[in-house]
């Protein structure tokens, strides 16, 4: 068994990158590691928007050598990433549910700038949504959204995602 564990350990300790600074994670507050990975997903898959449930991001990214083990601590769940064309009105519902909701970890996203009052009731929180290209979110337009299977299956109450058949 020892050769098997050595092989597994060597894979987990494989260096993937070098990070110059710590990227912190607060599941209910600011998540620099969440922001970073949402930007990676959005840009890497040429999506308009990246969304991820905050509860799926579990750790901080250390400075220095970044290993497979580090990434597995951050993303410990066996998630699959999908893209879907999502109607603007559905995306707005997802954002309303994901910001300021005390029952779930804060929604992580990239490609959007949101003006909202999280003290208001769900459905009344968001006053404006601007995409990274400067355009305003249009309810009738479809956007390429990248997210994980948990969100696209309606997990954490993200029922507007569930309609997209992932």
Per-range role (PLM):
Residues 1-19, 113-130:
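Binuclear metal-dependent phosphoesterase catalytic core
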Residues 12-24, 73, 158-164:
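Acidic/histidine-rich, surface-exposed loop or edge segments in extracytoplasmic proteins
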Residues 25-26, 35:
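Phosphate-interacting basic helix/loop segments used at nucleotide- and nucleic-acid interfaces
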Residues 31, 35-166:
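Feature captures C-terminal
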């Amino acid at each position: 068994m020892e050769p098997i564990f050595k092989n597994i350990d060597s894979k987990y300790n494989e260096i993937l990158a070098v990070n110059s600074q710590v990227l912190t994670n607060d599941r209910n507050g600011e998540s620099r590691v969440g922001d970073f990975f949402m930007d990676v997903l959005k840009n890497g898959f040429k999506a308009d928007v990246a969304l991820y449930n905050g509860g799926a991001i579990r750790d901080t990214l250390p400075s220095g050598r970044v290993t497979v083990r580090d990434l597995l601590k951050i993303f410990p769940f066996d998630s699959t990433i999908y893209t879907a064309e999502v109607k603007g009105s559905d995306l707005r519902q997802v954002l309303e549910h994901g910001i300021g909701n005390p029952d779930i970890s804060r929604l992580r996203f990239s490609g959007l700038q949101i003006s909202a009052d999280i003290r208001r009731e769900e459905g009344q929180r968001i006053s404006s949504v601007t995409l990274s290209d400067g355009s305003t979110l249009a309810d009738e337009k479809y956007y390429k959204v990248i997210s994980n299977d948990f969100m696209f299956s309606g997990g954490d109450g993200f029922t507007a995602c569930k309609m997209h058949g992932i």
